């Protein structure tokens, strides 16, 4: 068993304040898996925001845990009510981050972690302070292999995602941290170290 050295997060301490972490990556780079690992180790320190989307759940996804899956009509209703801090249309589907969801996580004394696309992360950066993390596959070839292995897209959809990944990769320099996910365990250790360091950064 590994020894863990970590100073407990104390949200009531005057130097501590809950933060918003954004984690973005091309489809297939491994962001969802890494965030699940983080959630298992630090359940009391942070909570993943529940993004809304109009797309269908993938086989491994759990409604109400990975996303809140809604109809086009429900998404439009939320949009009309200005419920979203950011929203995007991607591959014919809609994705949005609820401002109320982030506020509720902060009120609980935990950090909020938004697993969102690059465009959404950049919008959030322009509105509120964030800790922006970009996760990349080691190569386009590896990204394509992972998408094929995932098997949740048709060939046309997969090619669209691969083309879009080039645009996302070009925006990596707009993020504070970049993790090349060529080894899941090592990448998780890097992500964890970022989380712990930022958790105790003096923001005053």
Curated annotation (Swiss-Prot):
NCBIfam families: guanyl_kin (TIGR03263). SUPFAM superfamilies: P-loop containing nucleoside triphosphate hydrolases. Keywords: ATP-binding, Cytoplasm, Kinase, Nucleotide-binding, Transferase. ATP binds at residues 25-32. Belongs to the guanylate kinase family. It is an enzyme of class 2 (transferase). It comes from the Bacteria. InterPro entries: GK/Ca_channel_bsu, Guanylate_kin-like_dom, Guanylate_kinase, Guanylate_kinase_CS, P-loop_NTPase. CDD domains: GMPK. GO terms for molecular function: ATP binding; guanylate kinase activity. This is Guanylate kinase. It is found in: Cytoplasm. Residues 18-196 form the Guanylate kinase-like domain. One of its GO terms (cellular component) is cytosol. Its EC number is 2.7.4.8. It catalyses: GMP + ATP = GDP + ADP. Essential for recycling GMP and indirectly, cGMP.
